[in-house]
Amino acid sequence: MGAIAAGIAMAGAAIGGGVGDGIVISKMLEGMARQPELSGQLRTNMFIGVGLVEAMPIIAFVVALMVMNK
């Protein structure tokens, strides 16, 4: 049962991370199209946002390992 729960947790986190990355990057590209002079600042903020979004699957992986090792 723990393996099923771990698999579901990882699948949800991977889907959420992919969707979140797509949203962050698309909004950054929209901002760059509107104001090209801010592209450097937008790129920096995009990398921070992607890093925060990608933390979710990493945390889910650690939790999945903890659930499977119980």
From Swiss-Prot:
GO molecular function, one term: proton-transporting ATP synthase activity, rotational mechanism
Subunit text: F-type ATPases have 2 components, F(1) - the catalytic core - and F(0) - the membrane proton channel. F(1) has five subunits: alpha(3), beta(3), gamma(1), delta(1), epsilon(1). F(0) has three main subunits: a(1), b(2) and c(10-14). The alpha and beta chains form an alternating ring which encloses part of the gamma chain. F(1) is attached to F(0) by a central stalk formed by the gamma and epsilon chains, while a peripheral stalk is formed by the delta and b chains.
Transmembrane segments: 4-24, 47-67
Species of origin: Levilactobacillus brevis (strain ATCC 367 / BCRC 12310 / CIP 105137 / JCM 1170 / LMG 11437 / NCIMB 947 / NCTC 947) (Lactobacillus brevis)
Recorded family membership: Belongs to the ATPase C chain family.
Residues the UniProt record annotates as site (Reversibly protonated during proton transport): E54
NCBIfam families linked: ATP_synt_c, PRK06876.1
Protein name per the record: ATP synthase subunit c
Location(s), subcellular: Cell membrane
Predominant location category: membrane
Described function: F(1)F(0) ATP synthase produces ATP from ADP in the presence of a proton or sodium gradient. F-type ATPases consist of two structural domains, F(1) containing the extramembraneous catalytic core and F(0) containing the membrane proton channel, linked together by a central stalk and a peripheral stalk. During catalysis, ATP synthesis in the catalytic domain of F(1) is coupled via a rotary mechanism of the central stalk subunits to proton translocation.
